[in-house]
Amino acid sequence: RMQKLQTAREEIPKEDQYTLYRDGEVLVLGFGSVKGTLLEALDHLEGVGYLHLRLLWPFPEIAPLLEGKTLVTVEHNYSGQLADLVQQETLKRVHHRVVKYNGRPITLDEAVAALKAVKEGRAPKRLVLRKGV
């Protein structure tokens, strides 16, 4: 199983493993279905970047992109599994976990409000989105 991961890392081009859509002092990391909402949210935010992961193990390649940033993960799960993986594999601290686990998609309003709160220093370390409950 681990050999498959190594083979994927070697054979999948870097541009197909992750995409940095915009850099910023606040860097959001996401995976899967959060992409569309987060890309749209960037239009409403300054100083916020987005790194979209398409392969769950683009490590250690992304580590330099995380240097000196306020790191935020946005996820559709309870515990913030992507944040755990990023921290484990890059040794970089994820400062904020934005999570939603009620089965509803993250809305543009929720994403913008959460990321503004992070940028302004008002966000808790774990922010649970609840719209649509």
Task: Place the predicted regions along the sequence by residue.
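Generic long, charged, amphipathic alpha-helical segments
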Residues: 33-65
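Short coil/turn connectors at secondary-structure junctions
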Residues: 22-25, 46-48, 67-69
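Conserved beta-strand elements of the Class I
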Residues: 27-29, 72
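Generic secondary-structure signature for well-ordered alpha-helical cores
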Residues: 3-10, 43-47, 91-92, 116-124
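Peripheral docking tails and interdomain loops at the edges
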Residues: 71-133
